[in-house]
Amino acid sequence: MAVLDSMSTGSAPHHSVNREERKVIFASSLGTVFEWYDFYLYGSLAAIIAKHFFAGVNETTAFIFALLAFAAGFAVRPFGAIVFGRLGDMIGRKHTFLITIVIMGVSTAIVGVLPGYATIGVAAPIILITLRLLQGLALGGEYGGAATYVAEHAPKGKRGYFTSWIQTTATLGLFMSLLVILACRTALGTEAFEAWGWRIPFLLSILLLAVSVYIRLQLNESPVFKKMKEEGKSSKAPLTESFARWDNLKIVIMALLGGTAGQAVVWYTGQFYALFFLLQTLKIDPQTANLLIAGSLLIGTPFFVIFGSLSDRIGRKGIIMAGCILAAVTYFPIFHALTQYGNPDVFVAQEKNPVKVIANPDQCSFQFDPVGKAKFTSSCDLAKTILAKRAIPYENVVAEPGTVAQVRIGDKVIESFEGTTLPAADFKTRNDAFTASLGTALKEAGYPEKADPAKTNYPMVLLLLTVLVIYVTMVYGPIAAWLVELFPARIRYTSMSLPYHIGNGWFGGFLPTVAFAMVAATGDIYYGLWYPIVIAVMTAILGIFFMPETKDRDINHT
């Protein structure tokens, strides 16, 4: 932990980090890293989990369904924030985040032994989603406790620096999950890893749980909470004080819309959406994609502490808003460049032989079927389903009513067919033939099934991914201190946890699912970026004009 001392001198030269403070930062951060590792394993393995737990639907639909299960954990995070936030404000910070880490570790380990769809049928995805819900509840109580605990140990003028170490934990947890997955995949080989080896990273959670519990048992309660408890000033009804009184509720709402919503979409775009874009859209080898993301996280992670420490000097608000604005302005050119350098064959094919679906819009359905029940049998739907499965970008061209949909690839036109009234056997024959014709035409036009490793410009892809991570560090590094400083100590755990987890659980957690559904519906591989851009712009506007700067506030007030 010598790095803690060396990096702490920038904003408060008269205070060096003592042994107790180092222990607080290290123990809180390490336990939270393990918890994020548990939570993000699922997202890192979403494509493999889709095959094991969501069988019976096409590859794209199964992946979107797996993303929905991933998002289920995010959906309940605000409820975890309410349940454990209340406990944290009533019984203490330390004991509450001990409970959360046990729930997280056990539920993650169970995923490692859970039979798949082929063994226990529909019970498999149901149990999986239940475990994701438990993970979400646990994480909903973890972050607010860790951030509050560390901030309440920090000396004045050092809260941004101290809490920035907590801010590294989500990215380090993701990095750790990718590293473990990469090691297992390399050791076992792709076939064995995808068959059964993917379970090993989940089972590792038992060991991490034991380490985390031991470390946290060594900690003392927050000095702010102890003093408040001794003076009888702790809240007896933190939920009522937080959300039933307008003077505090309006701060909660603004912390969400003018802070955590934008922070969340920048965070998930820069890490998870970027990973899924490499895997699903650019068809880069999973091992390579994970390595590139892990490399960008390794390079970018120190900037959490840099921006957190910088916020102690120049303020939290300006850095966070700058990150939102930079992300919104540059996302489109960055992701276009990722295509150009990550899979140049797709980029060139798009330029030389653009794909167009010529169809009557009345025949075209919304290409999003997470439960696998929709029947895409019109000529338009059949064409779009095949293109979506291959992640082929296409434009929509309106055709006259009554015409059969066509797919134009450069100068070549392939006619689809109407399958609505065909018998099952005839439909399969026609669809197989149409799929084969379309596949041949796409191949001749230069659209690859997978990215060619020899053509990928790895340094440029890594640079672009690192820029995305830098945006993440700008919005995320200072935000824990900002949230802690917005609320009084007696209801801090509850009040800060809810906007954080609605922002990150809902606005951010659903981003991959919503964005890929937007892509599947439109055929534009960049269309999903509108979601984070709009949210980031909203946060920047509200944050700049309505949110206060808090770096000089006294956080001991109750």
How does the language model describe each region?
Residues 90-102, 313-324:
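Cytoplasmic membrane-interface "Motif A"-like loop-to-helix N-cap segments
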Residues 138, 160-185, 208, 334, ...:
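Glycine-rich segments within core transmembrane alpha-helices of 12-TM secondary carriers
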Residues 336-463:
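Low-complexity, proline/glycine-enriched hydrophobic segments characteristic of transmembrane helices
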